[in-house]
UniProtKB/Swiss-Prot annotation:
Its cofactor is pyridoxal 5'-phosphate. This is Glutamate-1-semialdehyde 2,1-aminomutase. Pathway: Porphyrin-containing compound metabolism; protoporphyrin-IX biosynthesis; 5-aminolevulinate from L-glutamyl-tRNA(Glu): step 2/2. GO terms for cellular component: cytoplasm. PANTHER family: GLUTAMATE-1-SEMIALDEHYDE 2,1-AMINOMUTASE, GLUTAMATE-1-SEMIALDEHYDE 2,1-AMINOMUTASE 1, CHLOROPLASTIC-RELATED. The modification N6-(pyridoxal phosphate)lysine is found at residue 265. Belongs to the class-III pyridoxal-phosphate-dependent aminotransferase family. HemL subfamily. GO terms for biological process: protoporphyrinogen IX biosynthetic process. GO terms for molecular function: glutamate-1-semialdehyde 2,1-aminomutase activity; pyridoxal phosphate binding; transaminase activity. It comes from the Archaea. It is found in: Cytoplasm. InterPro entries: 4pyrrol_synth_GluAld_NH2Trfase (IPR004639), Aminotrans_3 (IPR005814), Aminotrans_3_PPA_site (IPR049704), PyrdxlP-dep_Trfase (IPR015424), PyrdxlP-dep_Trfase_major (IPR015421), PyrdxlP-dep_Trfase_small (IPR015422).
Length: 426
């Protein structure tokens, strides 16, 4: 658990940052967040002298674990050459070519700096290409921190979205129509009325910011069909799933193709990145080729390009996926065994190197199902594991991630600690 050094730092941080942190989920660790001294492999080392097995992995980017030597070497090589140019250079071409090998071959790429920027640009691009104003998103799915997507469902009778944050005008939120994840009928209902005005349907192929909620069989394929029938573009937000479920992400894994793909997290190798990828006929609408504006001082940052390229090259060797997926499967199986042994109502959702446990009766196929979970019991599990030296997300609405650094011995140690933690839940 966080110690006195972390407490002292947090008290100082409270005077400097709203809530003491720079992203809200970091404040969810109670009674205050631990502060990191360093990290390597599957471990975080705190300023309080603790060593934690890390299953948060910076909320998804670190599929190779912390401080992978080949990524570190690539970053050091780039730093020797300079770290920001404001001019083109070869590495951005090489990373783009690598991405296009797996997403929209023959297409084009625009590098930005965050997943938020990627989805914001993708939505603007879809509107620019189609000349339409509405987008459709799914309640409980997260696509970053911009006005078009910080929108949830209103009352059952409402057609239009409502802001989920102060500071977003209702008029802006009403341009977003909200459907239910894994519910094709809700999409059909919206599209039957507004389909000729919808620029895009945007979806997390696996709802990774509502825990881990996989798509039902055929759900993504039906979205593909509906979008095409109405002349709308299908945006797959693969900021989490891209290069995680497979080299070709969820689109390869579930055999479905988006019109526009957004990437982030893994593709930056642990450095800030967002990517918009699509076929050439769509991407050429972006400036300077077209009239849909996008620009950024830090777009295609040299250090990020180096880290991202090195990460993908390691992933292409295949072993990292096998190790990460085996770890995810072993942990999911152990959690299922534990809840059965203790007679606890829970659902364990698992897709390769992503998993989450929901303390709820029945299965979890939607964010609405996830919201019914016993959040206090989940937080208790998080706290007990933290005491034992295992760090899982403090919110069940995030994923538990595994990586290539979570080898069988690390997983075995984790399983022992899971068993101890469950004894303390009773």
């Amino acid at each position: 658990m966080p110690g006195e050094v972390s407490r002292s730092l947090y008290e100082k941080a409270l005077t400097l940052f709203p809530g003491g942190v720079n992203s809200p989920v970091r404040a969810a660790v109670k009674p205050y967040p631990f502060y990191v001294e360093r990290a390597e492999g599957p471990y975080i080392y705190t300023v309080d002298g603790e060593k934690l097995i890390d299953y948060v992995l910076a909320y998804g980017p670190l599929i190779l674990g912390h401080k992978h030597p080949r990524v570190e070497e690539a970053v050091r090589r780039q730093l020797e050459k300079g770290w920001l140019y404001g001019a083109p250079y070869e590495l951005e071409i090489r990373l783009a070519e690598k991405i296009l090998k797996y997403y929209h071959p023959g297409g084009m790429v625009r590098f930005v700096n965050t997943g938020t920027e990627a989805t914001m640009t993708a939505i603007r691009l879809a509107r620019g290409v189609t000349g339409r104003k509405y987008i459709v998103k799914f309640n409980g799915c997260y696509h970053g921190a911009h006005d078009a997507v910080l929108v949830g469902a209103g009352s059952a009778a409402a057609e239009y979205g409502v802001p989920t944050s102060k500071g977003i005008p209702e008029e802006v939120a009403k341009l977003t129509l909200v459907a239910k994840y894994n519910d094709i009928e809700s999409v059909e209902k919206i599209m039957s009325k507004h389909g000729d005005e919808v620029a895009a349907i945007i979806v997390e192929p696996v709802a990774g910011n509502a825990g881990v909620i996989p798509p039902k069989k055929g759900f993504l394929q039906e979205l593909r069909r509906i979008a095409s029938e109405h002349g709308a573009l299908l945006i797959m937000d693969e900021v989490i799933t891209g290069f995680r479920l497979a080299l070709g992400g969820a689109q390869e894994y579930y055999r479905v193709k988006a019109d526009i793909t957004t990437l982030g997290k893994i593709v930056g190798g642990g450095f800030p990145i967002g990517v918009v990828v699509a076929d050439r006929k769509i991407m050429e609408h972006l400036t300077p080729s077209g009239k849909v504006f996008n620009a950024g001082t830090f777009n295609a940052h040299p250090v990020t390009m180096a880290a991202g390229l090195a990460t993908i090259e390691v992933l292409e060797e295949g072993t990292p996926y096998r190790v990460a997926s085996e770890a995810g499967r072993a942990l999911a199986e152990e959690l299922e065994s534990l809840v059965l042994s203790y007679g606890i109502d829970a659902a364990v959702n698992h897709v390769e190197s992503m998993l989450q446990i929901f303390f709820v009766k029945g299965e979890v196929w939607s964010p609405e199902d996830a919201a019914k979970s016993d959040k206090k019991l989940y937080l208790k599990l998080h706290e007990e594991l933290l005491k034992l030296g295992v760090f899982i997300a403090p919110s069940q609405m995030e994923a538990i991630f595994t990586s290539a650094a979570h080898t069988s011995d690390v997983v075995s140690e984790t399983i022992e600690k899971l068993r101890k933690a469950f004894k303390r839940l009773r």
